[in-house]
Amino acid sequence: SRRGAPRPPIEPFGPLLPGCPPLDADGDVRLIEFSARRPLHPARFHEAIDVLLDGVVHARGRLWLATTPDEAFWLELAGAGLRVGAAGRWLAAGGDGSPERWAMASAAWDETHGDRRTDLVVLAAGADPARIAEALRWAELTPAELAAGPGEWAGWHDPFGAMHADPCEDL
């Protein structure tokens, strides 16, 4: 067996291998929370996924895609594996929910959009948190796009359809 000091990790996720990642401000491992009250433009979000695939260890959360205003989507990313799939109807669109779900939704209920929102948590190793947040903000609808409303949004190209997994052929 080899003796001496252990060699430093040679891959970007090396700091995660011992178990508890070092989340100190000087480290390369970061936890990024992203929340948006405007829907995501599906084509721009599809492009923003490339940023998530570069240095992101794990990401998960629900998405509000403009082209499907009544359906919530769920994103799950681990390493290079990605899945975006249906997560049910928003409560504001008549979705079923337990009393607990209604209570949680009512705490952040929006008069216009109800419980529709995007919430993602991203664990990144060696990735730039500002770049990730910028890519996700870029995917949000602009104020003019938001004002156009769901009738306009329905005609946009949606690379997600009912679900999405990488590798993706819709680039």
Language-model features: locations:
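C-terminal accessory "lid"/substrate-recognition subdomains
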Residues: S1-T112, L146-L171
